[in-house]
Regions:
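Ferredoxin-type iron-sulfur electron-transfer modules in oxidoreductases and energy-metabolism complexes
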Residues: 1-7, 21-45, 62-91, 142-159, ...
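Gly-rich Lys/Arg/Thr-decorated short loops/hinges at beta-loop-alpha junctions or inter-strand turns
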Residues: 10, 126-129, 134-141, 191-205, ...
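Conserved phosphate/anionic-ligand binding catalytic regions in large, soluble enzymes, centered on
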Residues: 16, 139, 159-181, 280-292, ...
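Short amphipathic, charge-patterned alpha-helical segments
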Residues: 32, 219-221, 370-386
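Iron-sulfur cluster-binding cysteine motifs and their immediate structural context
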Residues: 54-58, 460-466, 544, 554-573, ...
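Flexible inter-domain linker/hinge segments
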Residues: 93-162, 314, 321-336
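Hydrophobic alpha-helical positions that pack around
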Residues: 115, 244-370, 382
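C-terminal accessory/binding modules appended to enzymatic or scaffolding proteins
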Residues: 350-362, 368, 532-580, 584
Length: 609
């Protein structure tokens, strides 16, 4: 790369790709070639920069100019102004929301200031389909060092001392997991990379595979050396076509370079990787269900013991780690256990990648040191709540996580603190909610997902969650009672205590955490038949104003349930008992005589007046 004077990096992650970053890349390349600059300026497709809210992203080196929301039509101006004349295109620069000033370098953006990219270190920096660029960024150096300088047990001890824990949700110590697998003798062992990522809205693992697949392949080979495995399998959901494409390319390139396959680097160690495709079932994030799916069986969890490290894929000892966990391994080997363990908290070392979403200004992929607070993530990295709304809650840990309140904003991000607060780390989903969100409806939404994703093997999860969802539906429809609230708490606790796997054991978390933190909303739904956020349609009331209605009958004609009565040129009335809250009457009324109320007492008052 040294022969080029300038490098233009174009984000080619799935998010930017869907916003035509591929056309941006092609237009920039064509424009550079047209100007005869192909020998001086290199156009590179990279992985995700993380700032998905502002994509497509284009970054120009060596001056680190960061352009946002670039369109294909902007390519000529970027080449003419920046590449040729050395002048920034100001209209494409990021604008600081507070100072309203343009920011040239991403290092000075609030979104990036508190991030520390370890697992994402190469995403947005290299072409993931070019192994030479990965090698230039130290890819496979850790594997070479391990194979030539360390024994398997010495390598495991490095991972143990680093304090690396599983990033897939449970947080089990990675070094200990490898040690257990290494102690079980067998004629064949397996290393499995869990790239299924079944959480809705989560894209941490996908982005790593799209942006830096060689870091994962290298880590799998290191793990294979440590536990005595010669075969690796990547279990990836078929819905990740770009990640699959780049991973296939990376595997082929690594084989060509002698970094996978027989006799790696002439050391006598052999290890190869193949891929298995999943259908995206959430339950297959659980390692025994994942293994069953890989074997062509139904994706159902099984009782432990035996653990996969004892009897896993095809009955052989199997080590399962997720993508983010593995991506940390090579850099730990190169920089040392002490370096990694100095980052984070006493029990949670290193960094964590989160998919930041919801009612927040800066939606995207972030990587932060363990111990950073929710407040710092939401207000400094995330840029605060959209449209000046008031913060209400943050849901962490995916669909099985808990909803935390403003009182929890100073909670540090680590496994123990989030669990103590009533939520969990999970794989890294983080959804911010504002004042317009109904917490009862939110709990119902997430529970609806786990009901659909339950494998059905154990009764507490299969039946219990369905009963929970039915009870929440009853409450959001204005038919709930005080007994229903007690039922939610009691049944949720039973499901947590008696379910077979992590899906069932954590599935009641959205319900139990909202009961703990937002009981007033449940009571309003049950006793006042009111949804303060206006999200529960059955608790909304359309009312016709006697002062404004002229009796044109337009609303009456469009009502599908004949809930509106009244004669021509007389005030009309809506029968609340049979109104289905479709809103057709309000859309049809040309005199603004129909209003939508959230409070039933106000409905009675409006009718009486």
């Amino acid at each position: 790369m040294s022969q080029y004077k300038m490098h233009v990096l174009v984000c080619a992650g799935t998010g930017c790709h869907s916003s035509e970053s591929n056309l941006v890349y092609e237009m920039l390349r064509d424009e550079v070639d047209r100007k005869g600059l192909g020998r001086e300026v290199q156009i590179i497709r990279t992985g995700c920069f993380g700032f998905c809210e502002k994509g497509p992203i284009v970054k120009i080196l060596p001056d680190n100019t960061f352009y946002t929301q670039v369109k294909p039509s902007d390519a000529r101006e970027i080449v003419d102004e920046h590449v040729i004349k050395g002048r920034s295109v100001h209209r494409l620069l990021y604008t600081d929301p507070e100072t309203k000033e343009h920011v040239l370098d991403s290092k000075h953006m609030g979104f990036y200031k508190k991030q520390l990219r370890i697992a994402l270190r190469n995403c947005g920096t290299i072409d993931p389909e070019n192994i030479d660029e990965s090698i230039a960024r130290n890819a496979y150096q850790a594997l070479g060092r391990v194979l030539t300088e360390y024994s398997p047990q010495e390598t495991i001890e490095i991972i143990k001392r680093s304090g690396l824990r599983g990033r897939g949700g449970a947080g089990f110590p990675t070094g200990l997991k490898w040690k257990i697998a290494s102690r079980n003798d067998a004629d064949q062992k397996y290393v499995v990379c869990n790239a299924d990522e079944g959480d809705p809205g989560a894209f941490m693992d996908r982005s790593i595979l799209e942006g830096d697949p060689h870091s994962v392949l290298e880590a799998m080979a290191i793990c294979g050396y440590c536990i005595g495995a010669t075969k690796g399998l990547v279990y990836i959901r078929a819905e990740y076509p770009l990640a699959i494409k780049r991973l296939k390319t990376a595997i082929a390139q690594a084989r060509d370079y002698g970094l996978l396959g027989e006799n790696i680097l002439g050391t006598g160690f052999s290890f190869d990787v193949s891929m298995k495709y999943g259908a995206g079932a959430f339950v297959c994030g659980e390692e025994t269900a994942l293994i069953h799916s890989m074997e062509g069986k139904r994706g159902e969890p099984s009782n432990k013991p035996p653990f996969p490290a004892q009897s896993g894929y095809l009955g052989k000892p199997t080590n399962v780690n997720n993508v983010e966990t593995l991506a940390n391994v090579p850099v730990i080997i190169l920089k040392g256990a002490d370096w990694f363990s100095a980052i984070g908290t006493e029990k949670s070392k290193g960094t964590k990648v989160f998919a930041l979403a919801g009612k927040i200004n800066n939606v995207g992929l972030i990587e932060v040191p363990m111990g950073i607070t929710l407040r710092e993530i939401i207000y400094e990295i995330g840029g605060g709540i959209k449209n000046g709304k008031k913060f209400k809650a943050v849901q962490t840990g995916g669909p099985s996580g808990g909803c935390l309140t403003e009182e929890h904003l100073d909670t540090p991000i680590d496994y123990e603190s989030l669990t103590a607060a009533g939520s969990m780390m999970g794989s890294g989903g983080m959804i911010v909610l504002d004042e317009d969100d109904c917490m009862v409806s939110v709990a119902k939404f997430f529970l609806g997902f786990t009901v659909e994703e339950s494998c059905g093997k154990c009764a507490p999860c299969r039946i219990g969650n369905k009963r929970l969802h039915e009870t929440l539906t009853k409450i959001t429809e204005g038919k709930g009672t005080q007994e229903d609230i007690e039922k939610l708490r009691n049944l949720g606790s039973v499901i947590k205590d008696t379910s077979l796997c992590g899906l069932g054991q954590t599935s009641p978390n959205p319900v139990l955490s909202t009961l703990d933190n937002f009981m007033d909303e449940y009571l309003e739904h049950v006793h006042d038949k009111k949804c303060r956020s206006g999200q529960c349609r059955s608790l909304l009331y359309y009312v016709i104003s006697a002062d404004d209605c002229i009796g044109c009958m337009a609303c009456k004609r469009v009502c599908p349930t004949h809930a509106i009565s009244g004669e021509k040129k007389e005030v009309h009335v809506i029968n609340q008992e049979i109104c289905i809250k479709c809103g057709a009457c309000m859309e049809k009324c040309q005199f603004d005589a129909i209003s939508l109320l959230k409070d039933y007492p106000r409905v009675a008052e409006a009718i009486n007046n």
